[in-house]
Amino acid sequence: MQESQETHISNHLDEVVAAVSITHRKKFQNKLLQTALFQPPREKLHLCEEKAKSYSNSHEYKQAVHELVRCVALTRICYGDSHWKLAEAHVNLAQGYLQLKGLSLQAKQHAEKARQILANSIVPPYSENTDVFKFSIELFHTMGRALLSLQKFKEAAENLTKAERLSKELLQCGRIIKEEWIEIEARIRLSFAQVYQGQKKSKEALSHYQAALEYVEISKGETSRECVPILRELAGVEQALGLHDVSINHFLQAHLIILSRSPSQVEAADSAHIVAHAAVASGRHEHHDVAEQYFQESMAHLKDSEGMGRTKFLSIQDEFCHFLQMTGQKERATSILRESLEAKVEAFGDFSPEVAETYRLLGGADLAQGNHSGARKKLKKCLQIQTLLYGPQDKRTLATQQAMGMLSTAPKVASKPRQASKAKVAFCTSIPQDTLLGKARPGTTAD
């Protein structure tokens, strides 16, 4: 695996070099293309940098990385192999890779390349250049983030400490202004928080998240969109520490910021869903109303959706039913499940985990009401789907088989209350944690 990664990295360096080469295959008829071809390298570099920013702001990270690769090549042409600007181009490319999942190793490699170039570039007049020092902060921070993504927490913290120390020195020397330092410090504190969170040190992470949020609120405003991811990560740590009231409040604060920014229906639904989850996670009765309110709000945003929005609606609806069952509202949950069955068949197909689980829950509800015929019919349908999806030896299939076996003997043990009670337990309408709708894992076998 390591060998394949190294090969990929080697190939990737070739990609950067290849970006310099321009092969003239045919004459361009379009004057615009001819103009672009004969643009001076610095103009091309500026154009690529602008394109990369635009793609990144639009979350089109693959296209952004493609432009950043070209920037590295053009920067080498414009400034040479030993200029700090080339190191900066490598760091920008490393940041681009960090936005793509699974490419942290490439990001680390480019950050190391940048450090190597910078080490050979710090000679007069660079040693007096504030831009070089400001870039050095970015280099250490980017290296720290890359190491964090690779779960090398100690090395990540060391690089973040260097970035923090250098930023303070520049502030004290008057090389950067206070407002600029606050923006830098916000990013460094957030990365520190993520390092501690990665180490499962929630208490240490908490103070850094709080500091990061404070700095972002100062620099960007309390209702800026940049606050949302920090608020959610902060709330997650508070939740892990059992601070459910403040956790829910921070999730709500993030939700209100999202709503103030004219979100799409799906984005608004996701945000409300997060609040509902936080309220359920507290396990407290006083948060039940909050959970129901935001489940309902989430579903309202998606009610008339089609395609992916429709499947998301049905999944959230199932979680809401699970919540209702947990809070003793089983009849209401059963009614919603019955109404949802046809829509699930249409959205997921007849033979899907979602449909199988709904049949299982409805069968359990029928049994609880003494409707053995209805329970048997629904559980049989559930068993057919589970056998097809997971195989006859999967623990879910075996559990349904066992439940049907107990159901077939139910009339014979009607006079034995304790055994009848056990039979009902097997048909509990609560959704098991490892088989939440939409989370089923085909092929999982019995333990």
Curated annotation (Swiss-Prot):
Any one annotated GO CC term: cilium
Localisation per UniProt entry: Cell projection, Cilium
Lipid metabolism found in the keyword field: no
Keywords linked to the UniProt accession: Cell projection, Repeat, TPR repeat
Pfam families linked to this entry: TPR_12 (PF13424)
SMART domains given in the database record: TPR (SM00028)
Primary localization class, coarse: other
Extent of the TPR repeats: 45-78, 137-170, 186-219, 356-389
GO biological process: positive regulation of smoothened signaling pathway
Highest taxon above the source species: Eukaryota
Known function: Participates positively in the ciliary Hedgehog (Hh) signaling.
Description of how the protein assembles with itself and partners: Found Associated with the EvC complex composed of EFCAB7, IQCE, EVC2 and EVC.
Name of the protein described by the UniProt record: Tetratricopeptide repeat protein 23
Organism listed in the record: Homo sapiens (Human)
Name of the gene this protein is made from: TTC23
